[in-house]
Amino acid sequence: MPKELRVGVIGCGFMGRTHSNAYRRLNNFFPVEHRAVLKAICDVNGDKAAQFAATWGYERIETDWKKLVAAPDIDLIDICVPNKYHHDIAIAAACNGKMVTSEKPLAMNVEEAEEMVKAVEDAGVANMVYYNYRRVPSITLAKQIVDEGRIGKPFHYRAVYLQDWTIAADVPQGGDALWRLEIGVAGSGVTGDLLAHSIDTALWLNGPIARVVAKTKTFITERKHAVTGKVEPVGIDDACMFLAEFANGSLGTFESSRYARGRKNFNAFELNGADGSVYFDVEEPEYLQFFEYHQNQSGKKTEPHLTGWRKIHTSNAEHPYMSHYWVPGTCIGYEHTFLNALADFVEGIEKGKPAQPDFRGALQTQKVCGAVLESARTGQWVETGL
Ligand code: SOE
């Protein structure tokens, strides 16, 4: 008899959908011991929850998250609501002995994140934050290449994450669809939303960031509130750029904006080391580009006439996660990054090796975001404390 993993998901938005899809597909693709059971979906709007439950196959709905986190038929609470609610839900769930997973960023700020780490660790419950881009096979392959020592001494890390959906001045802020623009609900703008992904990937590939200096910009300073209709100041950062110094001595540049006309979800990075480089951009997610100057196994330099960037189609069974899917040469998509993350989480429970980033891991990203925002306020270099 497979063990059951009875899930209660809180939030019916974009992330509620990506996570629900992952639960539904888990046992089709990954040979884990647990069977995911979509027990309950929670949203304050009961009609919305009922519609969502019918679409995704949840057994029941709940409109009060406080009831769900205490429900005896739930093993895992999965937080897919706006950032403002992560802290209270996660702590209540952990206090009730539930496993907890959450969408990124972990919290509104470092203080909240630290309290959440303490709660899950005191309760001894499994936990993870969905930094899903780590589970793009090409990015996981980049990690493998770095860990194999093929990049050599790192010099530069370069990340950009660009979108363009807030350029129009008449886009409101707030409400179900546009809470990412409301400071009191999101905590920050592109820093916590987009750069948090870039930072998580950077920490994973290139180690701790020691210090940062940042500049943020809010291009449109007032927007109508989607619910109240009142024109209110905009408190989020529309764009953020920062310089970073990694603990390993390499230098980083990070750039993010929601005003990069034409860019819908351009999440890219490059790492340059003495022996090689890797480059990825999510508009071509099935490729990882790798430049090898010096082969680490043979110690030989690549022959000059063969030197060049390799564009690796990450679709062989030997590539990360791909043995679970189709035949070589075929691709997987955005939704599978959540499925891969869930599979890692469940395997982590089964093997007693927690999937990363857990809450403590995600606290590192939160600290870098906090330092970036502080630096943007003060104009000074800020130590991250990592
Ligand atoms: C923002 O537009 C957003 O939906 C992020 O919140 C997600 O984390 C990102 O992956 C796609 O863009």
Which residues does each PLM region occupy?
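Glycine- and charged-residue-rich phosphate/anionic-cofactor binding loop of Rossmann-like
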Residues: 35-39, 347-364
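Hydrophobic residues in well-ordered beta-strands that form the structural core
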Residues: 62, 102, 108, 127-129, ...
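N-terminal Rossmann-like dinucleotide-binding module
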Residues: 1-56
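C-terminal glycine/acidic-rich active-site capping loop/insertion
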Residues: 224-233, 241, 245-246, 269-270, ...
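Predominantly a Rossmann-like dinucleotide-binding segment in NAD(P)-dependent oxidoreductases
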Residues: 133-234, 288, 379
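Glycine-rich, aromatic-lined ligand/substrate-binding cores of catalytic
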Residues: 193, 201-211, 216-224, 230-286
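Short acidic low-complexity segments
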Residues: 31, 60-72
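Beta-strand-loop-alpha-helix segment that lines the small-molecule cofactor/substrate pocket
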Residues: 76-134, 149
